[in-house]
């Protein structure tokens, strides 16, 4: 068996749904960026449950799932149902990205959106205020420990891994 044929790759089971959701709710971004975020969230596992209670492929906390479900008109759907959760997560991430509307690079906008998805938009906005209104992702994330303490490391790693997984997907590394 050659190394290339035995190499692990990112699961492609939900690629069509991820691509469709990203094109609708994250226009202008490569759909694999949303796939990388879902991979970071749950390893693309719709049955995933985090130690703090986040659920499904997009790792929704119960209150956020109820809010987003209501906004999308979902009734009696579970965050463990892959397709609706992929759509709802892309919708929610798109909302986080659009919140960071000041002129800045698209990569910073996505990173700030992902940090908001992970740590809560209020915490990332507070970090921006603590940093004197900083605009760039690197500057804002550097102040996050002053807002969330040790949890800031988790958020910084979360965003770094999304970009790493996306790069690996593009290069076919993993």
Predicted segments — roles?
Residues 13, 29-34, 39, 52-55, ...:
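Extracytoplasmic
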Residues 35-39, 58-62, 115, 160, ...:
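Generic alpha-helical structural context detector
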Residues 1-17, 66-91, 95-174:
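Non-catalytic cell-wall polysaccharide-engagement segments
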Residues 22-31, 102:
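Short, charged helix-capping/linker segments at alpha-helix termini
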Residues 13-25, 48-49:
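Peri-catalytic and regulatory segments of divalent metal-dependent proteins
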Residues 48-69, 132-134:
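Short, surface-exposed glycine/acidic/tryptophan-bearing loops
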Residues 42, 62, 84:
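Acidic/His-rich structured neighborhood in mature extracellular/periplasmic domains
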Residues 41-49:
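Conserved alpha-helical segments that form or flank metal/cofactor-binding pockets of metalloenzymes
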């Amino acid at each position: 068996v050659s190394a290339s044929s035995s190499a692990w790759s990112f699961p492609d089971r939900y690629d069509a749904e991820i691509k469709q959701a990203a094109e609708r709710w994250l226009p202008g971004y490569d759909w694999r960026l949303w796939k990388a975020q879902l991979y970071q969230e749950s390893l693309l596992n719709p049955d995933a449950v985090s130690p703090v209670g986040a659920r499904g492929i997009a790792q929704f906390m119960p209150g956020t799932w109820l809010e987003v479900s209501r906004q999308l008109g979902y009734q009696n759907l579970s965050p463990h149902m892959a397709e609706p959760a992929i759509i709802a997560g892309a919708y929610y991430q798109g909302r986080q990205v659009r919140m960071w509307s000041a002129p800045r690079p698209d990569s910073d906008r996505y990173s700030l959106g992902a940090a908001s998805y992970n740590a809560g938009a209020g915490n990332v906005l507070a970090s921006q205020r603590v940093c004197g209104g900083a605009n760039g992702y690197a500057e804002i994330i550097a102040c996050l420990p002053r807002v969330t303490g040790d949890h800031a490391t988790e958020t910084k790693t979360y965003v770094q891994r999304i970009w790493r997984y996306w790069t690996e997907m593009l290069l076919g590394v993993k």
